[in-house]
Amino acid sequence: MSPTNKEHSAGGVILENGSVLLIQMQNLKGEKVWTFPKGHLEPGETAEEAAVREVEEETGWFCEIESDLYRAEYSFEREGELVDKDVRWFLMKRAGGDGIPKTPDEIFDMKWLTLADAENELLYRSDLAIIDLLKHY
């Protein structure tokens, strides 16, 4: 196995009236999964800038950050290489946009769900940890 690669990503969790916005996308195994919008930091970009950009690209909503929410650190294997990933999550509110994803080839669907319903749809440990945090907001 080759040396470990490091990746930094950021994402946003839009919470409105007790519901969160989830996106459906394809994971590395080719399966459709529900998750929160996120993506890699571009060179020179802060985590906050990346989160706002990714949420707008993947949901069509321009959002403002309300607070730092969660940090996930985990490792996984991709094409025989170990990747150490660091993801910063921000709590956001909608401030404009049309709700039409700018990356329709990546996003299959979007839906608003209550925290309880979202918990039943989400598979990733970090996403479920975010739901647990939001229950106490």
Region annotations inferred by a language model:
Residues 130-137:
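A small-molecule sensor/coupling module
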Residues 1-36:
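N-terminal strand-loop-strand
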